């Protein structure tokens, strides 16, 4: 289903290239954007089928996939009278959750893609999308080709780097109507920062300076785009990840190892679901436990042979499993699996 969405994950483009799905054009006004999409990504429109009517869609397709996100928007609302299986990617499901959930239900959506098993791990999702428990298909971000190992392990700083956003529920960027329900939900639970562990690290930057460097923004700043992510990864042996209070592995969980940097993350099962294993292809610490985090950094920074073996296994692991083509094939397999059962 195409409605003129501006951006897309790299694996979605690979999915289009690999499987040549038909495109359902929800409104003719999106045709110029579709042509721009094809031209930008050097796709041959003659290799694809285009469908412009609900009747044609029902006659041709068994499954309707939508990667637009924002189902509450008119251009992305689910096609209610499509008789086949409907699977929608929620993307950032924190935007206007009530309207999004109502649109999914009204449109008869059967399953949703998510960045992890949100129905098991994210209390916000559980509260706002109760009808989709057991109906979430987890899809990892994967990593772009630019994330390459450029600096040998031995030449990197023997420290951990903390980087990424530190979103809050009260900063100027997020105190907008889109996030009102999200902010209210977590503030009522006594939480101030979406990236809770990163905020804990910010508060201990000086104390941890001997073993940790930090590029984490300080409130009210929540993001920092002033540095090159690939270059920064290549400067360090380890980096620290954060699953946020939404509990999903961020893109950095795949990008960092692809760039040759060992991930340190919590022992939350959202990482294990994607086959990250402590001491094998990552290093885990107890959730929100700074003492355990410090202990793990101390151990591996003095056991570099073990750390280098983890680095090698992790790099091979993510390059085989989480390149965009591999993620696209995973999505196709998951859709096929769901179809066979419904």
Label every PLM stretch briefly.
Residues 256-258:
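Short alpha-helix at the nucleotide-sugar/activated-sugar donor binding site of glycosyltransferases
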Residues 282-288, 299-304:
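Conserved acidic donor-binding segment of nucleotide-sugar-dependent glycosyltransferases
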Residues 99-100, 274-283, 295-296, 313:
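Acidic, glycine-centered active-site loop in nucleotide-sugar glycosyltransferases
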Residues 261:
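Phosphate/pyrophosphate-binding active-site loops
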Residues 302-336:
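A charged, aromatic-enriched C-terminal amphipathic alpha-helix characteristic of glycosyltransferases
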Residues 86, 160, 282, 297, ...:
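Short amphipathic alpha-helix in glycosyltransferases
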Residues 1-253, 264-275:
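Nucleotide-sugar donor-binding catalytic core of glycosyltransferases
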Residues 336-342:
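Generic C-terminal helix-cap and adjacent flexible tail
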